[in-house]
């Protein structure tokens, strides 16, 4: 008996010793973030690459800026590995990591199992682990969020102009609050915000042939929702031709010989996914699970690794276009850009953008033009292409103006261009005059609209499709105005933040100063109108809104970010702007049931506003202008406006970016 007790004590001692060793052993670390850990405070705030040179990095030395490192960085120049936090008690997470999502295989409706279903191979939606970027909109300090942003430069390779603007606003607010940069995550709709939840990887045994799985009545209902609510704003498909193939497929005769079965089934699944997502009355978790399951089927059926080896077809372009639209509402940025690039290149090879090769009929020619218009719209995900011919003409005109606005803000100077002596398309000091001309073009275009297309006469239109087209056109107009005047809004803060004394601020204002002030106000006025228009079209009692809810969230985010920027100066954050700000918050709260991202976006906005208005984080001079600390960068100072010549080189795009997807 004593021997057994001794043995038990010995085993217990060994167990305790092993437990102590495991407790002392370091937890598994994420890969070293060399770029982020070595970055100086200035480069960290601007979210740009830094070589970590000491005492001055190359970027700061080139621009003559003060270069400083935090004490923690100095103590650990090789970067600090972050330990994986202990898993908390299972609770609903704000936005789950894609790697941890378990997606059910069962369908949302009662199904009948097939005797020998077609089984998909493992076509992964995920990028390699080195580039994975789990998304969230919460704040640092939560155990779920400690490994969110491993490398923002890599994860936002296709960063939109609005996304960069939002990132700079939140970064500056964090700096003013005495927090490290990127304390507040600023995911942006149509860039990296998971509006549709986590798509995740398709199950290994996903059933692809679901003709008998999905009841015909339920499939008819989803298809009807798509034609009535999604197709008017995304006229990618030919309704008559698609319905003929759909009837043949469900009747048992199969798809026609000229139709690629896998591509058509992939398109049908994306149609179902969009039809499910647009239904605002379905609970969020159920809607995401069902829609993402359809999307996973579509991805597996398309077999993306085989697209490059297949001959191009109009059906393939249509499938890629719809897939791109769905991916825009996920955090699969690489897949989004890949789908867009493939669609555009295949359409170009098929000569969809010219009439050199005449199609067999006028209907085919019209369809090709619609598909090409959708390809053009891929450059800006909020560019919704309407269904009517009149709308199509006006939309193309507005798109042309928007293209020139973008060109006026693109950096056309780089090292190679300077070496070759190439002229710049737009000089930096010309943007004021160019903006006036472009604003006149927008006004002229707006005045050319017929009376029944004007915003004040919208209540007279009873046809839902016609109203949707008209509303979308006005959303695009307001967005273009915001985009046009946003650089002047940023420039205004740069000038005020650099004012050395109160006496300098009291000097008589010049014409340029007044122009900047007025353009900033016009930018905020457009954001106010955008907010009011969303409130006008949103009816919480409607199961499906006249505008898809993800577009409403996108425009609310645009308006909210600009209102946050207005809080930096009391002369711009007027009572009317303040009312519009609270209207944005109320509208986001009304959309919280649609996506976890919307819930945390509202909380992020409130937190950022509280930091701006907190007396501990700012000081106000005699003119009501927020004076930033000497060590803190202005809203868009060093990296965006280097001098009084209105340098846009670091603000919106670089030449390399223009080859990618450049959104507003």
Swiss-Prot record:
Stored Gene3D superfamilies: Zn(2)-C6 fungal-type DNA-binding domain
Q: Where is this region: Disordered?
A: 68-102
What biological function has been recorded for the protein in this entry? Answer: Transcription factor that acts in concert with sor4 which is a transcriptional activator of the gene cluster that mediates the biosynthesis of sorbicillinoids, a diverse group of yellow secondary metabolites that restrict growth of competing pathogenic fungi but not of bacteria. Regulates the cluster genes in a light dependent manner. Also plays a direct or indirect role in regulation of paracelsin biosynthesis and cellulase gene expression.
A GO MF annotation of the entry reads: RNA polymerase II cis-regulatory region sequence-specific DNA binding
Which processes are annotated in GO (biological process)?
A: DNA-templated transcription; positive regulation of transcription from RNA polymerase II promoter by galactose
Q: Which UniProt keywords apply?
A: DNA-binding, Metal-binding, Nucleus, Transcription, Transcription regulation, Zinc
What does the entry say induces or represses the expression of this protein?
A: The promoter contains putative CRE1 binding motifs 5'-SYGGRG-3' and expression is differentially regulated in light and darkness by CRE1. Photoreceptors BLR1 and BLR2 negatively regulate the expression, while ENV1 exerts positive regulation.
Q: Which domain of life is it from?
A: Eukaryota
Query: After gene disruption, what is the outcome?
Result: Decreases the production of trichodimerol in light and darkness. Also impacts production of paracelsin in a light dependent manner, with increased paracelsin levels in light. Also results in increased cbh1 transcript levels and correspondingly increased specific cellulase activity.
Name used for this protein in its record: Sorbicillinoid biosynthetic cluster transcription factor sor3
Q: Quick one: a GO cellular component term?
A: nucleus
Species per Swiss-Prot/TrEMBL record: Hypocrea jecorina (strain QM6a) (Trichoderma reesei)
Q: Where in the cell is it found?
A: Nucleus
């Amino acid at each position: 008996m004593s021997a057994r007790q001794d043995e038990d004590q010995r085993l217990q001692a060994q167990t305790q010793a092993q437990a102590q060793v495991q407790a002392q052993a370091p937890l598994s670390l994420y890969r070293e973030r060399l770029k982020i850990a070595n970055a100086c405070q200035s480069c960290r705030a601007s979210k740009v690459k830094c070589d970590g040179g000491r005492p001055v990095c190359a970027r700061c030395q080139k621009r003559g800026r003060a270069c400083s490192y935090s004490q923690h960085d100095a103590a650990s120049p090789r970067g600090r590995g972050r330990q994986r936090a202990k898993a908390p008690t299972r609770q609903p997470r704000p936005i789950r990591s894609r790697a941890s999502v378990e997606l059910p295989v069962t369908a949302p409706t009662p199904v009948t199992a097939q005797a020998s279903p077609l089984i998909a191979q493992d076509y992964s939606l995920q990028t390699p682990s080195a580039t994975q970027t789990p998304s969230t909109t919460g704040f640092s300090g939560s155990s779920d969020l400690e490994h969110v942003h491993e490398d923002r430069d890599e994860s936002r390779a296709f960063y939109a102009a609005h996304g960069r603007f939002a990132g700079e606003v939140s970064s500056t607010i964090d700096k003013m609050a005495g927090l490290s940069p990127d304390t507040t995550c600023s995911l942006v709709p149509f860039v990296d915000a998971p509006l549709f939840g986590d798509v995740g990887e398709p199950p290994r045994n996903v059933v692809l042939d679901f003709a008998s799985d999905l009841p015909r009545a339920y499939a008819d209902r989803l298809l009807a929702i798509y034609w009535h609510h999604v197709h008017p704003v995304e006229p990618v498909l030919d309704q008559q031709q698609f319905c003929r193939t759909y009837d043949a497929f469900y009747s048992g005769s199969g798809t026609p010989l000229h139709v690629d079965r896998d591509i058509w089934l992939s398109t049908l699944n994306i149609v179902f996914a969009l039809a499910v997502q647009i239904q605002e009355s379905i609970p969020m978790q159920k809607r995401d699970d069902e829609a993402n399951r359809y999307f996973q089927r579509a991805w597996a059926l398309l077999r993306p690794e085989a697209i490059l080896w297949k001959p191009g077809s109009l059906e393939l372009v249509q499938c890629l276009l719809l897939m791109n639209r769905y991916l825009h509402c996920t955090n699969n940025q690489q897949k989004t850009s890949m789908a867009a690039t493939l669609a555009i290149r295949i359409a170009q090879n098929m000569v969809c953008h010219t009439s050199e090769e005449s199609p067999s009929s006028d209907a085919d020619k019209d369809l090709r033009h619609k598909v090409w218009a959708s390809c053009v719209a891929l450059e800006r995900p909020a560019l919704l292409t309407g269904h009517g011919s009149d709308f199509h003409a006006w939309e193309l005109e507005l798109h042309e103006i928007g293209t020139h606005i973008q060109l006026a803000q693109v950096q056309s100077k780089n090292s190679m261009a300077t070496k070759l002596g190439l002229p710049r398309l737009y000089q930096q000091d010309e943007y004021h005059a160019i903006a006036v001309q472009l604003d006149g073009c927008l006004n002229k275009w707006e005045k050319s609209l017929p009376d029944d297309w004007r915003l004040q006469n919208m209540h007279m239109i009873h046809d839902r499709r016609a109203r949707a087209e008209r509303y979308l056109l006005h959303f695009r107009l307001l967005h273009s105005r915001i985009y046009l005047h946003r650089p002047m809004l940023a420039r205004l803060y740069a000038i005020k933040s650099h004012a050395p004394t109160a006496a300098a601020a009291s000097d008589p204002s010049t014409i340029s100063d007044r122009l900047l002030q007025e353009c900033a106000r016009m930018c905020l006025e457009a954001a106010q109108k955008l907010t009011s228009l969303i409130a006008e079209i949103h009816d919480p009692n409607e199961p499906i809104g006249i505008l898809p809810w993800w577009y409403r969230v996108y425009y609310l985010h645009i308006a909210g970010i600009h209102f946050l920027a207005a809080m930096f100066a009391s002369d711009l954050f007027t009572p009317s702007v303040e009312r519009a700000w609270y209207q944005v918050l109320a509208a986001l709260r009304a959309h919280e049931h649609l996506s976890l991202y919307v819930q945390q976006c509202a909380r992020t906005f409130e937190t950022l506003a509280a930091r701006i208005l907190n007396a501990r984080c700012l000081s106000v001079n005699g003119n009501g202008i927020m004076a930033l600390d000497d060590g803190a960068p202005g809203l868009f100072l060093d990296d965006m406006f280097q001098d009084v010549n209105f340098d846009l080189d670091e603000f919106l795009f670089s030449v390399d970016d223009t080859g990618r997807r450049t959104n507003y």
